[in-house]
């Protein structure tokens, strides 16, 4: 039977509960245990699919098409296990399920209430489908004390009594701030956070304390005394140079041993940390460095491109180089020539986005990469803009644009009005709902034999994750190919363009899907490995 670890956060948000959960899962895996990670988000949105990237950050898409929290990306990258739609739940989804059941009459006329109906639905989500796992780690979003998190805290409190003894523990992540005027770390915020948690009936078994400097033993003893946890269960979580340093750091602090001890488990074998030590060695001892420009729309918030940032780093690991990212707001190139900025970089990447803002600036960056033979990688929207740029500047198609931007006689990119979902043909219109209406999840693509991208993959049939509402218009394929743009990948039915490239360019590839979502530190995505390899070659020419 699975054992449950519930991870809560206190004092402030953005302490890194997702990284803490992923790191603990990696440590348990290194000891030979099977682990599942789940995220419970208290917001009322059904999913983050329609939320602004500036508010929520990246939307992480799973193989089965769920739009989920970006922490699931950390879970996948640290454990190598693919998440699915059942690994992330929101208050909105919980309430939607309950209302649907109430309308069907499933509650037999009962008054539907937060307790027991909402909490029962949360508990059902937490405990379903865990038979094959040794541990289930559940991260509770938000901060203790948030009113919207109360049903989740009540649900995990109840599970402590409903599951067998020693099958549930609580890890509380908190902050110990340093007050420079006093010259000391302060324990009081953590004490109050634990007090708030205890007020809802939850007593943490382990305190994971974030700090920017080592915590003195006297302060750890103080936390142990006032927060009612064992001295060894006060684990310091110091700031690390990279997130991939965290598992080793937590192991050295004894987090995994303390978790097993809390469950009454005393394994004889230490975890095998060899691959984590290899990764951190590569990160801190690169054999060179390159610089790439990411020309994007949401560059003001790096969390909007979290998986992309990590995938680029993985490409650097594969090539034993440090990759410096120069974040460029695409609107900059709508006001000025990109040459002075881009001539210094070794590669250009245009990531996914929605809407017309910054599109012209991105196309100027794409034109620069094409004409100057700089390695270029276009993802989703980046591929679509590469096709529009070719239509305008090579094929000389008048008013070439996207129907997402404006009405045009030559929509190189158009709205997907219908596609198969399972065996059902779904249709949507411009006035329909936006939530869950995109092409989402893993789909197959057929790559041309001997194309550059097929050589990179080492195969001609691939499965990649998609998240898009618009597609390159197949009606313009022949005209664009006559101008040298190769449609090197198509959907198996030959209807949807999936990849493009220029045969006479050192490295120019656009993909309709999101390869960054499947890249892992121990298994870098081949496209990112190849792209960074090309930038290394470019660095020798600049």
From Swiss-Prot:
Q: Where is the Glutamine amidotransferase type-1 domain?
A: 291-541
Which positions in this protein are listed as binding Mg(2+)?
Answer: 71, 139
Q: Any keyword Glycoprotein? A: no
Q: Which GO terms describe its biological process?
A: 'de novo' CTP biosynthetic process; pyrimidine nucleobase biosynthetic process
- What are the protein's UniProt keywords? ATP-binding, Glutamine amidotransferase, Ligase, Magnesium, Metal-binding, Nucleotide-binding, Pyrimidine biosynthesis
UniProt function note: Catalyzes the ATP-dependent amination of UTP to CTP with either L-glutamine or ammonia as the source of nitrogen. Regulates intracellular CTP levels through interactions with the four ribonucleotide triphosphates.
The entry describes its oligomerization and partners as: Homotetramer.
Q: What is this protein called?
A: CTP synthase
Q: Which gene encodes it?
A: pyrG
């Amino acid at each position: 039977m699975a054992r449950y670890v519930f991870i809560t956060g206190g004092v402030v948000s953005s302490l890194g509960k997702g990284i803490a959960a992923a790191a603990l899962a990696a440590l348990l895996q290194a000891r030979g245990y099977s682990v599942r990670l789940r995220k419970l988000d208290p917001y009322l949105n059904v999913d983050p699919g329609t939320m602004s990237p500036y508010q929520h950050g990246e939307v992480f898409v799973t193989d089965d098409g769920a739009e989920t929290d970006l922490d699931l990306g950390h879970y996948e990258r640290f454990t190598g296990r693919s998440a699915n739609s059942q690994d992330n739940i929101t208050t909105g989804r919980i309430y939607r399920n309950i209302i649907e059941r109430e309308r069907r009459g499933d509650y037999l006329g009962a008054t539907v209430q937060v307790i027991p109906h909402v909490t029962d639905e949360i508990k059902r989500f937490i405990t379903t489908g865990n038979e094959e796992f040794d541990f289930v780690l559940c991260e509770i979003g938000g901060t203790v004390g948030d009113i919207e998190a109360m049903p989740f805290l009540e649900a995990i409190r109840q599970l402590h009594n409903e599951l067998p003894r020693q099958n549930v523990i609580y890890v509380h992540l908190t902050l110990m701030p340093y007050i420079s005027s006093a010259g000391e770390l302060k324990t009081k915020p953590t004490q109050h956070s634990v007090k708030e948690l205890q007020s809802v009936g939850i007593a943490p078994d382990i305190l994971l304390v974030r700090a920017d400097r080592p915590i003195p033993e006297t302060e750890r003893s103080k936390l142990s005394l006032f927060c009612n946890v064992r001295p060894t269960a006060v684990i310091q979580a110091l700031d690390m140079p990279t997130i991939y340093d965290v598992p080793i750091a937590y192991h050295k602090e004894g987090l995994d041993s303390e978790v097993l001890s809390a469950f009454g488990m005393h394994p004889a074998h230490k975890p095998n940390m060899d691959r984590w030590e290899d990764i951190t060695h590569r990160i801190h001892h690169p054999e060179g460095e390159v610089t790439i420009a990411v020309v994007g729309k949401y560059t003001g918030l790096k969390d909007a491109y979290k998986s992309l940032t990590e995938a680029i780093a993985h490409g650097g690991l594969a090539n034993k180089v440090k990759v410096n990212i120069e974040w460029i707001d695409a609107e900059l190139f709508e006001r000025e020539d990109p040459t002075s900025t881009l001539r210094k970089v070794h590669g250009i990447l245009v990531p996914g986005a929605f809407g017309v803002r910054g599109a012209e600036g991105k196309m100027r960056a794409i034109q620069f990469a094409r004409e100057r033979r700089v390695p270029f990688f276009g993802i989703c929207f980046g591929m679509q803009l590469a096709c529009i740029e070719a239509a305008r500047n090579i094929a000389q198609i008048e008013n070439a644009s996207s129907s997402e931007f404006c009405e045009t006689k030559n929509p190189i990119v158009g709205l997907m009005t219908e596609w198969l979902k399972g065996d059902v043909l779904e249709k949507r219109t411009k006035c329909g709902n936006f939530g869950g209406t995109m092409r989402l999840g893993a789909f197959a693509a057929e790559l041309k034999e001997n194309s550059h991208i097929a050589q990179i993959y080492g195969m001609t049939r691939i499965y990649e994750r998609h998240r898009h509402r618009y597609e390159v218009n197949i009606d313009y394929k022949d005209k664009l190919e006559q101008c040298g743009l190769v449609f090197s990948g198509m959907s198996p039915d030959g209807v949807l363009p999936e990849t493009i490239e220029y045969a006479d360019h050192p490295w120019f590839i656009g993909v309709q899907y999101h390869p960054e979502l499947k890249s892992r530190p121990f298994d870098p995505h081949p496209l990112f490995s190849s792209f960074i390899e090309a930038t290394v070659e470019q660095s020798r020419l600049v």
